[in-house]
Amino acid sequence: MTIAENSMQRPSLTSLTRKAGAVTALALGLLVSGAYAKIDDSARYEPVAPTIDQARANILIARQLQFTHFRNLGISDELSGDVFDAYLNYLDSQRIYLTQEDIDALSRVKKHLGSALKTGQLQPGFDIYNLVQQRVIERLKFALGLIDNGIEQLDFTADDRIRVDRSEAPWEANQAALDELWTKRIKNAVLAQRLNGADDDAIEETLRRRYEGQLKRAYQARSEDAFQAYMNAFTGMWDPHTSYFSPRTSENFNINMSLSLEGIGAVLQSDNEYTKVVRLVPGGPASKQGQLQPADRIVSVAQGDEKPVNVIGWRLDEVVDLIRGPRNSTVTLEVIPANASDETITRTIAIKRDEVKLEEQSASKDVIELDRNGETYRIGVINIPTFYADFQAMQAGDPNYKS
């Protein structure tokens, strides 16, 4: 069962779907990169808060689960402990951010999550999310501090042991214990790269970029991130295949299932503070227009004749939302060309949006011939890269819908 929301935050129950593996988030194609610019030390995490629309959506989701799901599971405080554990497993599955002290402090909200979810009281779940995000930031800053001090300062003579999979490990007692754990994690990462032949300067640069990227993403947390995580911990109580999709996730899911989208047909990723073009979808509007090129970096996005919006430093999914749009509409991109000598050189590219067919994910067939003992055999081969079904076309009665 998939519980999805449209852009008005009203959830609706769609047909029973089972997710076979992770759903790739295709915007124009969404790929997340680990390359980011150095984080401003003065940056502060802004706690996220639930919205009225999310509270309403929560109530509707609770009703749908109670009255339309095949599993007859009531919503009460008896459910609270399981929701709490599932939520923490989602937010800190390896138990590397929170401490036992944190878990004990959260016990005050743990007991009543069930009744709160039934009535749309989301603040307890958001309090947990904000605490985890704050702990994530603290841990990443600690890691960056170790790297900035120089990895040569780390003691590699100690008889250290580290548990790689910590999903079943006990929570560390306090912040001091977490400091020790994270020091071991950094030392383990350094040793792994040394064994691969990297020198210390390269190792420091790699680790710094890794943790700065994670830190930037932590600062960019949004209310919808917390809501989706919390709702999935909640809906997962009914069965593993009951999921909540936010409007953005629902749209990406439909794109992947229908193998088509309306946009410009460009695969994007984050690169420092920019959104960079990775590749163009063959036959898509951007590919046909011919000006946008791989490795171009997007500076601003404009809709039709409207003023451009500067998108430097934006989250990748938010940039994608600006670039997507209905077919036959025009989006204008200001980009730094891949071959630009410096970042002050930009050009403006207007592209008319259209339907983009993701043919590379479609099933394909081929016939190969094999010679064996003087005989030629023709063998049919069917390649199915992914499972898909265009639900919208199917519901519209199109006899030739893609599936």
Q: What are the functions of these language-model segments?
A:
Residues 5-22:
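Bacterial N-terminal signal peptides that target proteins for export
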Residues 21-31:
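Bacterial N-terminal signal peptides
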Residues 35-39, 205, 221:
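Boundary at the C-terminal end of the N-terminal hydrophobic targeting segment
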Residues 39-47, 58-70, 108-112, 206-213, ...:
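Acidic/histidine-rich, surface-exposed loop or edge segments in extracytoplasmic proteins
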Residues 49-50, 63-76, 216-222, 244-261, ...:
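Cleft-lining beta-strand/loop regions that shape enzyme active-site pockets
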Residues 55-59, 63, 77, 81-89, ...:
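Solvent-exposed, polar/charged alpha-helical surfaces in well-ordered, non-transmembrane soluble domains
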Residues 75-161, 215-270, 330-332, 341-368:
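Extended, small/polar residue-biased N-terminal targeting/export presequences
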Residues 89-90, 111, 125-141, 145, ...:
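PDZ/PDZ-like domain segments forming the peptide/carboxylate-binding groove
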